[in-house]
Curated annotation (Swiss-Prot):
The gene is araA. It comes from Escherichia coli (strain K12). It catalyses: beta-L-arabinopyranose = L-ribulose. Its cofactor is Mn(2+). Belongs to the arabinose isomerase family. Its EC number is 5.3.1.4. This is L-arabinose isomerase. HAMAP family: Arabinose_Isome. Pathway: Carbohydrate degradation; L-arabinose degradation via L-ribulose; D-xylulose 5-phosphate from L-arabinose (bacterial route): step 1/3. The lineage of its organism: Bacteria, Pseudomonadati, Pseudomonadota, Gammaproteobacteria, Enterobacterales. Induction: Induced by arabinose. Transcription is dependent on the transcription factor AraC, the cAMP receptor protein (CRP) and cAMP.
Length: 500
């Protein structure tokens, strides 16, 4: 059972009565065949549900209206099997508030060269029916996704599946509640922002809860529940001597388990799926939540430190998008650099809170070590290195008049040396196209020091996310050149300025 099982995507066929009942009967048969095949063979994350043909303005409007009010409907896939005059779609598309994908396909893959006649031509008109539909989208200034390819093509399946992930993520985001335990880290700019504007743009709500409210729930957790969770720790992780049953830091592990159970109960009771903490506001907690946060992220919760609600929300959104995909997704921070000619590296980490979903080790190390920041007892944490391979880091920032998504494509590498004195999980990567270009572009674009790191998602996923939410995206990859990048920032400023 995954979040995708809670949603479905409606498959809508556009046609008209001009061609007669026999043609419409064949269109319906083709649609049933295609939907059944896609549900069976395409490995789509969501079920496709075939809706009645849209052959009149009233029928199309009814489908779009019903989609809006059906909470299970994540979006619409539209196929213009025959020519479907696009004025019929205006009212429906005007009111539609669910994501829309135009599947530019046709039932047959090859033309029947010896038998093709006008009946065949009239039945299979995607080539120009799709263009008519595209015009009305452009005329109405409504962005929608387009996938071209035969319905049996695996690449088309993958693209539809990727779009479905975005559509479900968007519906989940509309119901997302972000809990901030405490406020923003004092005097920090980029982690702050306009929460009302965010709720208007994305749908998620952000509210603050006193740490004392959390502490009450933490203190209500029974010793039996704590011991049961620590037994789980024993089976899942490599425990250092200090954390084992007679170790000198065993009590810190028990307290970390109590915090995890209390946090999870608080989040579940409030319907929260993302949260933040700050080391400046830990009143009543015996340690900064480290292990608890790591494990909650692995369970799908969004998180960011220092009150950074935008990154916490983005992490949850990306967790939903990547459900079931290979590779993990985590809160991250660009921490420090390794400058070496031709081998510049970024070491990413945070004080404690890196998600084990990106761990290279099957059993991370569970340890308790000193943490000066926060002024509390030594916190428990998981320590691990990160899987190697292509990845991305993404940052969502508030520019006042709009949101900007920054994405840097990176290549994670194996740590060339052991890190015996580094008591936190970490990731090591090469930034594309190189560290000087990537860091300068990131700084010029205003990217945050907090990011979401993902092996599971790629640049195309984030482009789709930006398009679906109608926000700016700024990309730093192997094709980035600083002069052109600066020009793009200037052009974007003008473009979005005109749209205000």
């Amino acid at each position: 059972m995954t979040i995708f099982d809670n949603y479905e995507v409606w498959f809508v066929i556009g046609s008209q009565h001009l061609y007669g009942p026999e043609t419409l009967r064949q269109v319906t048969q083709h649609a049933e065949h295609v939907v059944n095949a896609l549900n069976t063979e395409a490995k789509l994350p969501c079920k496709l549900v075939l809706k009645p043909l849209g052959t009149t303005p009233d029928e199309i409007t009814a489908i779009c209206r019903d989609a809006n009010y059906d909470d299970r409907c994540a979006g619409l896939v539209v196929w213009l099997h025959t020519f479907s005059p696009a004025k019929m779609w205006i009212n429906g598309l005007t009111m539609l508030n669910k994501p829309l994908l135009q599947f530019h396909t046709q039932f047959n893959a090859a033309l029947p060269w010896d038998s093709i006649d006008m009946d065949f031509m009239n039945l299979n008109q995607t080539a120009h029916g799709g263009r008519e539909f595209g015009f009305i989208g452009a005329r109405m200034r409504q962005q929608h996704a387009v996938v071209t390819g035969h319905w049996q093509d695996k690449q088309a399946h993958e693209r539809i599946g990727s779009w479905m992930r975005q559509a479900v993520s968007k519906q989940d985001t509309r119901h997302l509640k972000v809990c901030r335990f405490g406020d923003n880290m004092r005097e920090v700019a980029v982690t702050d922002g306009d929460k009302v504007a965010a709720q208007i743009k994305f749908g998620f709500s952000v509210n603050t809860w006193a740490v004392g409210d959390l502490v009450q729930v933490v203190n209500s957790i029974s010793d039996g529940d704590v011991n049961a969770l620590v037994d789980e720790y024993e089976s899942c992780y490599t425990m250092t001597p200090a954390t084992q049953i007679h170790g000198k830091k065993r009590q810190n592990v028990l307290e970390a388990a109590r915090i995890e159970l209390g946090m999870k109960r608080f989040l579940e009771q409030g319907g929260f799926h993302a949260f933040t903490t700050t080391f400046e506001d830990l009143h009543g907690l015996k340690q900064l939540p480290g292990l608890a946060v790591q494990r909650l992220m692995q369970q799908g919760y969004g998180f960011a430190g220092e009150g950074d609600w935008k990154t916490a929300a983005l992490l949850r959104i990306m967790k939903v998008m990547s459900t079931g995909l290979q590779g993990g997704t985590s809160f991250m921070e660009d921490y420090t650099y390794h400058f070496e000619k031709g081998n510049d590296l970024v070491l990413g980490s945070h004080m404690l809170e890196v998600c084990p979903s990106i761990a290279a080790e099957e059993k991370p190390i569970l340890d308790v070590q000193h943490l000066g920041i926060g002024g509390k007892d030594d916190p428990a944490r998981l320590i691990f290195n990160t899987q190697t391979g292509p990845a991305i880091v993404a940052s969502l920032i508030d520019l006042g008049d709009r949101y900007r998504l920054l994405v840097n494509c990176i290549d994670t590498v194996k740590t060339p040396h052991s890190l015996p004195k580094l008591p936190v999980a970490n990731a090591l990567w090469k930034a594309q196209p190189d560290l000087p270009t990537a860091s300068e572009a990131w700084i010029l674009a205003g990217g945050a020091h907090h990011t979401v790191f993902s092996h599971a998602l790629n640049l195309n996923d984030m482009r789709q996310f930006a398009e679906m939410h109608d926000i700016e995206i700024t990309v730093i990859d192997n094709d980035t050149r600083l002069p052109a990048f600066k020009d793009a920032l200037r052009w974007n400023e003008v473009y979005y300025g005109f749209r205000r």
